[in-house]
Curated annotation (Swiss-Prot):
SMART domains: WD40 (SM00320). It is found in: Golgi apparatus, trans-Golgi network. The modification N-acetylmethionine is found at M1. Residues 337-362 are annotated as: Disordered. InterPro entries: EIPR1, WD40/YVTN_repeat-like_dom_sf, WD40_repeat_CS, WD40_rpt. Interacts with two multisubunit tethering complexes: EARP composed of VPS50, VPS51, VPS52 and VPS53 subunits and GARP complex composed of VPS51, VPS52, VPS53 and VPS54 subunits. Interacts with SNAP29. Belongs to the WD repeat EIPR1 family. The gene is EIPR1. It holds the Pfam family WD40. This is EARP and GARP complex-interacting protein 1. WD repeats lie at residues 159-199, 209-249, 253-293, 297-337, 372-412. The lineage of its organism: Eukaryota, Metazoa, Chordata, Craniata, Vertebrata. One of its GO terms (cellular component) is trans-Golgi network. Gene3D superfamilies: YVTN repeat-like/Quinoprotein amine dehydrogenase.
Amino acid sequence: MEDDAPVIYGLEFQARALTPQTAETDAIRFLVGTQSLKYDNQIHIIDFDDENNIINKNVLLHQVGEIWHISASPADRGVLATCYNRTFCCVLSLDSFGALGKSSAQLFIALATSSDSKVLTCAAVWRMPKELESGSHESPDDSSSTAQTLELLCHLDNTAHGNMACVVWEPMGDGKKIISLADNHILLWDLQESSSQAVLASSASLEGKGQLKFTSGRWSPHHNCTQVATANDTTLRGWDTRSMSQIYCIENAHGQLVRDLDFNPNKQYYLASCGDDCKVKFWDTRNVTEPVKTLEEHSHWVWNVRYNHSHDQLVLTGSSDSRVILSNMVSISSEPFGHLVDDDDISDQEDHRSEEKSKEPLQDNVIATYEEHEDSVYAVDWSSADPWLFASLSYDGRLVINRVPRALKYHILL
């Protein structure tokens, strides 16, 4: 049973931001944000035609700065949020230096400007052109197509809170609630007036020694979407969005910086985390003294971990060892004994076989290691339309689309 070959798409700029178009459940579509210091940055809308195994694309200009994080509305296909760098420079006048002398004053201004220019990571909500919400039929090498621009809906004002790390949407919501992490602040926003206005509804701050900063966060799809998990330094924390109070804390979750985390979509107390200690850990938030399971398959920092939205035993990780690993964590999944069918559907002969099968949990294992990348893999994510397909993005701008091996797919389904 031969598997389909991976499909590779190359961006002309470096990139680290990737998201599926979450509200799109029919077409396979991903959004990729670039990081260029010299040129206008872009968002590439990537459509994957799985029948013909080809990629179609459209390009949107993102002129405000290099993109560090991108996320898509769960309710509106045309709405997305980005975190991006903006540089604020100090402007001084020669006249203010009086008798210092023109050449000395110019040197002073040059030094002051270079040292006082401030880079702030901001966040904004955007709308793509209406005709691009549902995809494209252009080929990847169609250079005649002109890039279109995004419509700015609103800024998330972070002038009082610091650098934005990420923006996450309420997973089951109407696209009106988002959370942003800015330095040591967690900020809950209400989007009003068709997302053209962001009102800060509530906030909380990390308290402690040193300069505490959030690195990532995820909104739990469970508990009526009232819980968010965050990572800062080596610590994982859970928050109740109704009171913005801390509900659990996993100190020293990793030996080094925690890079990412994700919730199991089918088991409400389970989450996965990854970090600079090269490990992926799985946690039960009811008992945080030690992880339920630990994976040590990567040889460098693990930047991303993602549960499959439908089959939670499938876990994707991406690392700066340039590899993507697909693991089968069936023993801690919602179906540890495999796919079980109703007794009424089993014949006597099949009954004996199913009893044999269900005596002990299936074994966890690495399904596949994907090595199509040649640079650090900063993002991996599952398609929101096809549970057997995923994308990975490396810093050199290479986007790779892969599928779960057919043999495993049929094993899970049958």
